[in-house]
A protein has these predicted regions:
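Hard-cation-handling environments
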Residues: 2-15, 69-70
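General beta-strand structural signal in soluble alpha/beta enzymes
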Residues: 2-3, 55-58, 214-215
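Structural signal for hydrophobic packing residues in well-ordered secondary-structure cores
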Residues: 9, 46-53, 204-211
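A short, gly/pro- and small-residue-rich
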Residues: 13-31
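Generic structural signal of hydrophobic/aromatic residues within well-ordered alpha-helices
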Residues: 16, 20, 45, 200-203
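Short, low-complexity, polar/charged sequence segments that are solvent-exposed and flexible
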Residues: 19-23, 74-78, 209-214
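C-terminal catalytic subdomain
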Residues: 25-161
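Extended hydrophobic packing segments that form well-structured cores
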Residues: 106-231
Length: 231
């Protein structure tokens, strides 16, 4: 299901559908946010591959530098600040994938709307552990492409709202620039709980994604085709 939760739903029905969406996803019926059709398809693929609940998150939120310095640096391997990001959505992640959960209201929408019509989010920090961050997408001329990256959700409190977690992916900064931005990917990424890159790679090949269009997070020292070798 790819529903128009933002910004139209709450003004028509008097509540936000985040919690309902999370319940459907928990039952194996993936629901994407903001009419993200390829996001819903990516979630479905992840559900089948992982045989588990998945989620869909915004990937364009950074981890505050002070939080990184206090709670992450030197405590979880060699992750740099650029390797981390806040995976966030209003409240669509299933309760079984949250460390604790609570029904709340959509704080961003409530800045301009009555709180009573923004009720319906399911909020909490996402469970720590291994994840696969991935997406299938089409270009404007109907050419399909995809990306896959292994990483983890860190066991660090986000101190924020929504369904949210602190994600760490090796060389995420370079991956973000040379795959996500250069590939014109939207700001939503699907998340499977575990490492499923090997299977996802074969699935993407099977459905016709050219191997050169399957992006992944290159290890340090392995250059992206457009990466400046002198940088």
């Amino acid at each position: 299901i790819a529903g128009k939760c933002w910004p139209a739903f709450q003004t028509q029905f008097g509540f936000v559908p985040c919690y309902v969406n999370s319940r459907l996803t928990a039952q194996g019926i993936p629901v994407s946010c903001e009419v993200d059709i390829y996001g819903a398809l990516s979630e479905f693929i992840g559900t089948v591959v992982s045989q588990d609940v998945v989620t869909l998150l915004d990937i364009n939120n950074s981890v505050p530098a002070d939080l990184y310095e206090e709670d992450i640096k030197g405590k979880y391997g060699t992750y740099t600040l650029k390797d981390t990001f806040m995976g966030f959505h209003c409240g669509n992640t299933a309760a079984c994938k949250l460390t604790a959960h609570e029904m709340k209201y959509q704080k961003i929408m409530a800045r301009s709307l009555p709180i009573e019509v923004t009720n319906g989010t399911l909020e909490g920090d996402i469970v720590p552990g291994d994840i696969t961050f991935f997406r299938l997408q089409s270009t404007a001329d109907a050419q399909i492409r995809a990306y896959i990256a292994h990483g983890e959700v860190l066991p660090v409190a986000t101190r924020s709202f929504g369904a949210i977690g602190i994600f760490a992916i090796p060389e995420m900064g370079r991956f973000y620039r040379h795959v996500l931005i250069e590939g014109n990917y939207p700001h939503h990424g699907a998340v499977a709980f575990g490492h499923f890159g090997k299977t996802l790679y074969e699935v993407f090949k099977y459905i016709g994604v050219p191997v050169e269009e399957i992006g992944y997070n290159q290890p340090a020292g392995v250059r992206y085709p457009t990466e400046n070798p002198f940088a």
